[in-house]
């Protein structure tokens, strides 16, 4: 049936109305101007619209519905996919069950949706919106929105974009499956990665890039290229795998599971940590903090300013200190533990170590040689001093002696040797030799064997301790990694008579051992006859009594006590 002017209804049960319309499909309906409904049960209306497929619908101006059940409306739109829908201006619904709207949009993937201006949804089930955004072919379920952005990975999401602060186009790109790119000039390349933030000038530096799988880059011009890496802040790089983290400004976390923070720091050793400014942690599991510090040894720690911890498990702190020996510690200012001096410790200023496993107090010149004021040598136990030993109150030099009866002796008694033995007893008036006076508080105490049994090590005929070189085996963790490297060291030769099943009791804790002052100012018991400026000798009870010669009496300190000088 035709009505109007110049219309043609050639299809069975077709209906054409308006001006120059054509309804050639069965049960088709055309109306308006120059419309064509050629598909069965199709409907064309408006001006120059074409519905050429079964049950298709074209309306508006210059629209085309070219596939079954497709719907085109608006101006110059095309619905070419089965059950597709195109609306707006110059939109194209190409894929099956797709939907385009807005201006110059394209929905090519199955069940895709494109809206906005010049957006393209090529991936199946994808969605584009905004201005010139796109999802690429193969990017199923992707979503691109904003301006100029592209989502190329399956289930990826790109948003934001537009222009940088200089006005340069700066779109975002999400190419990794399940990735997310947002902000300005960002890129998410890795699987399930996330890039956010941007750049002030994309022509000079790109925005954040999340290249590693499960990585996260945020801030300005950051990069996370390692697996599960995280970069944040300004121009930071997290390139180490398995959880590296770079934050702050111009920091780099390049080792596995490393962490760099602060300003221009680098953590390159496995599980290393660098913080502060210009610090570097290159040793495995090392830590560098402060300013311009370097922790290059495994498990090393450098802190302060311009310090270096190079030895395994070494520690450098302070200013310009260097710990080159394994397990060593340098602190203070311009101190150095030299290579090979394992386990040494130095503190102070302007000095270097002399021995391994030893303690050093440096006091070198600012311009001149490096020096030590004090050294305790670990292997021998020797104490080296470049100065005076000062005792604030105690005055005598004493040595430890054992009593002949095994009983304690209180301070203030004169003592002598008991016969031909090395043991002592109280001195009497008839003794021609006086060893000294039992001291209550000596300034120096010798032969105390306070730290060990006096025969713990093998000695020669002159009582000199004998030493040997021993090999220290390497130590590995449960995964086979070397925790401590093998080495050699000098040790005293252990006496085979030593019994480790017995507990050693130091002489100072045993009643039979007493300190005898043999030189210096000593307090002595007296019978009340001694006079300052006079002399004394022991009576039969081992206490002082006035004498014509003997020990000089310096002063009376109590009714029954005087201070004498022993030499």
Outline where the language-model segments fall.
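Periodic small-residue-enriched repeat registers in elongated scaffold domains
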Residues: 1-384
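Extracellular receptor-binding modules and their adjoining Ser/Thr/Gly/Asp/Asn-rich linkers
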Residues: 362-567
